[in-house]
C-alpha cells in the first residue's frame, strides 16, 4: 500500500474517533503509526518543548512571551523540527515554530 494511502487511512480513522467523541488516548496508536510512516521515509520529527532556547539556535524560529531574558525555554511548539536523512547526513527541512519564555 502506498504511503499516501496509509496516511489517508490513519487520518480517516482519527477523524472517526474524534467524531465519535473518543478521548485522546484512543488516538495515540494512530499518531504513532503516522509518525512511523514518515520515519520509514527518512524523516525525523523532533518536539523541542521545554528545551532551553537561545538566539543561536538555528533549528527554531521563536516568538517571545513577555520580555526577553538571558535564559529562555520553549513553552509551546506550533510546528516541530523536521530533518530528512539523505545519504548518511541529516538535512533540516523545517525549523520549529515556537513560543519561548523566561526561565
Regions found by a protein language model. Give the residues of each.
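Extended, amphipathic alpha-helical stalk segments that mediate dimerization
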Residues: 1-21, 29, 36-103
Amino acid at each position: 500500500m502506498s504511503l499516501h494511502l496509509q496516511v489517508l487511512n490513519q487520518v480517516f480513522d482519527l477523524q472517526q474517533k474524534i467524531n465519535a467523541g473518543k478521548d485522546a488516548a484512543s488516538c495515540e496508536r494512530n499518531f504513532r503509526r503516522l509518525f512511523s510512516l514518515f520515519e520509514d521515509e527518512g524523516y525525523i520529527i523532533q518536539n523541542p518543548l521545554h528545551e532551553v532556547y537561545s538566539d543561536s539556535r538555528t533549528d527554531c524560529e521563536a516568538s517571545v512571551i513577555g520580555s526577553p531574558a538571558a535564559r529562555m525555554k520553549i513553552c509551546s511548539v506550533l510546528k516541530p523540527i523536521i530533518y530528512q536523512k539523505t545519504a548518511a547526513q541529516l538535512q533540516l527541512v523545517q525549523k520549529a515554530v515556537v513560543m519561548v519564555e523566561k526561565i
